[in-house]
Amino acid sequence: MLILDNKYVFHIPLYKYADNKLIRLDIDETLSNLMQQLNNEGYESLYKTKVKSYYKSRSFDELLITLFVSQKRVSDNKQELPDKVFKRWFKQNNNILQQEAYAYEHNNSMIIESLE
């Protein structure tokens, strides 16, 4: 039996906020790059869900990428933790995403890191 004891949920913006308006992002290729990076680290199964979010009185769509991992398996296989892959990807692509912060969930915690 395999027990996946760690849950990660990565918040992927589909819009940027500029000049007092929401502008849809064209991130299909960039998002495919994240999927490839996660796959390269051995994270082959995940869920992608489109949700409606609210922030600073603005309503917008975002993607939630959810994956469950086994901490023991990650350690045994010397895999990079998925949050490290996500953080690196987000910082490398923030010229496209143009966000002030990124957010992800790990188990029962929400982590938000400023990019400014």
Report residues per predicted region.
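Positively charged, small/polar-rich N-terminal and surface patches that mediate targeting and assembly
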Residues: 1-116
